[in-house]
Amino acid sequence: MAENSESLGTVPEHERILQEIESTDTACVGPTLRSVYDDQPNAHKKFMEKLDACIRNHDKEIEKMCNFHHQGFVDAITELLKVRTDAEKLKVQVTDTNRRFQDAGKEVIVHTEDIIRCRIQQRNITTVVEKLQLCLPVLEMYSKLKEQMSAKRYYSALKTMEQLENVYFPWVSQYRFCQLMIENLPKLREDIKEISMSDLKDFLESIRKHSDKIGETAMKQAQHQKTFSVSLQKQNKMKFGKNMYINRDRIPEERNETVLKHSLEEEDENEEEILTVQDLVDFSPVYRCLHIYSVLGDEETFENYYRKQRKKQARLVLQPQSNMHETVDGYRRYFTQIVGFFVVEDHILHVTQGLVTRAYTDELWNMALSKIIAVLRAHSSYCTDPDLVLELKNLTVIFADTLQGYGFPVNRLFDLLFEIRDQYNETLLKKWAGVFRDIFEEDNYSPIPVVNEEEYKIVISKFPFQDPDLEKQSFPKKFPMSQSVPHIYIQVKEFIYASLKFSESLHRSSTEIDDMLRKSTNLLLTRTLSSCLLNLIRKPHIGLTELVQIIINTTHLEQACKYLEDFITNITNISQETVHTTRLYGLSTFKDARHAAEGEIYTKLNQKIDEFVQLADYDWTMSEPDGRASGYLMDLINFLRSIFQVFTHLPGKVAQTACMSACQHLSTSLMQMLLDSELKQISMGAVQQFNLDVIQCELFASSEPVPGFQGDTLQLAFIDLRQLLDLFMVWDWSTYLADYGQPASKYLRVNPNTALTLLEKMKDTSKKNNIFAQFRKNDRDKQKLIETVVKQLRSLVNGMSQHM
């Protein structure tokens, strides 16, 4: 029962499998058959049985079908056999037709192949044309690039390269020639860089050579503009009725207008002739090189190279020649090169972007300015010619004004000019020292004579002299001063003008200029003129008459100082009442010179007295005096009288001092003559003769050779001699010794040492002519008295030395 139930269950399954096999593609039968074996054991046998049964069913169906269609098949075969004969005939016909068709189509095939070949060629040509149309623009651009390179149009060439790389090469990048072009472009760029850099180097060398011409042109232009402005200012001043002074002479207004008109016309002509920096230098290499490096993306390299090279050139330009200080052309060449350098840099700054910056030019200018100041300070110190220093100042002002017009700060240059101004004044002082020396050498040191009104006015026009008494005198007459006074006055004014020349164009106020003029004039008076006067006074050949005239001259020069102050005031238009106005020190200068001259008068006078005294020829052993004064002394007194008459033109105090000094010196000289250590013995006759000479000196003193002495003041110069001689002449030793040291002593001025020295010279020791020889014969008691006096005098001398 169980087996039957299992068999019943497998039958539907086997039918399903068979249906699946019949309806499924043979490729998928494998899994279906595998399921037969995966089922129950012996299931495949049952399946085989079922399969055999199914096959038998199908065979039966086929057999039924064949039996049904068999007659039709037989009929079809019969029909087919009948058609077979016709088919063979048709085959023969078709074969013949085919042969004939093949024979006929051989030419067509040949022509067709030709057509195909032509079509292929046509297609290839079309393709080539299309490719060539792509390549031709590239080749044309590359050819254009070559032409631009040949024509040195490098910036355009670089632009063409950019177009080739960005537009044209992508179209034909697959072709070999394009790769060659692409590989060649970097080399062309490097060539362009090298060529443009070479052009830049040539440009830098060119502007280095032309810097002086560029600077000269720029400085001329600045000078013309300044002159034009000054001319306009003068013209405007004339319109307002202001008086114009050119140099020292006042020029009428009509002449001024003519001069200014001519000046303006000349300025217009000069401006037309002036070239600009663009006219002198071709800047295209710089622009071209800058654009090229900008296109190449290497602008920073170009800027660094340009700035580095220009700094090197700046150092070369700023290096002066060793002999630059010898001529103004050396300074001019130095300035023009520097101006040319910075004019080029300023032009580059304004026409390019980034190549030169304001910070860079300022740094370069500050470096250059420090070097320029150091160079000018060093080289100007070698200048000894004031004209050269003045030309250097004018050049420096034009140099500063030129660069200031281009925006460079130049205040330090004007500060330097103030330093150079001190040096300029020093050179002026040295020059005027020579001028003053020449004036003093040429002066005859005698009053200026004038014989008519014309000569009188000429002197008055040169020197501000006012004397109503002299004006009233009839011709011929004489000015009290000598010829050097108006010459000195004129030269002082010339010095002021020369000093003013340097102060012009320094952008300083009138007050500062006035102060500078007064200070420089003070230096001229207190140092140069004073030194020249002192040297003149001390010269050996200057005599007493000349010294007297020098004192008179200094008096008039001192009085003229106020006119010099007015002269400076008229130039600067600064009132003397201004608080900070410097006063001229001429008063003290001429006072010092006058005092020196007075002292030299005293010295010269004493020297002259010494010369007369040296002529003294006393016979110190004479027994009796000659009865008259010595000849040398009378000559001396006559000389002193004539000299003191000349002193009447001097101030009274000077003449009195000179007279007193002369008498004191004469008294001292006579005293020294008596006490001379080489004089061993003196006779009483010699003393009496000497007394006669002293009496003449006292008579001269009492005759009042110079007015103004009170009483016997001048005679007191000989009081020492008088008391000494009276003591020996009267032989009043008892009174001298008794009253010694008393204020009311008759011989108060006689020094014991002096008396002892003279007494010993008169004492007879061993010589037969001794004055005391007769005493030993006639009166030995008196001899003892003398010995006693000598001992007492020595005692007084020793007492004095102990107190000292």
Swiss-Prot record:
Keyword Protein transport in annotation: yes
UniProt keywords, alphabetically: Cell projection, Cytoplasm, Exocytosis, Protein transport, Transport
Cell compartment(s), UniProt: Cytoplasm; Cytoplasm, Perinuclear region; Cell projection, Growth cone; Midbody, Midbody ring
Main location: cytoplasm
GO biological-process terms attached to the record: exocytosis; Golgi to plasma membrane transport; intracellular protein transport; membrane fission; mitotic cytokinesis; vesicle docking involved in exocytosis; vesicle tethering involved in exocytosis
Subunit and interaction comment: The exocyst complex is composed of EXOC1, EXOC2, EXOC3, EXOC4, EXOC5, EXOC6, EXOC7 and EXOC8. Interacts with CNTRL. Interacts with RAB11A in a GTP-dependent manner.
Family stated for the protein in its record: Belongs to the SEC15 family.
Function description: Component of the exocyst complex involved in the docking of exocytic vesicles with fusion sites on the plasma membrane. Together with RAB11A, RAB3IP, RAB8A, PARD3, PRKCI, ANXA2, CDC42 and DNMBP promotes transcytosis of PODXL to the apical membrane initiation sites (AMIS), apical surface formation and lumenogenesis.
Listed name of the protein: Exocyst complex component 6
Taxonomic classification: Eukaryota, Metazoa, Chordata, Craniata, Vertebrata
Gene: EXOC6
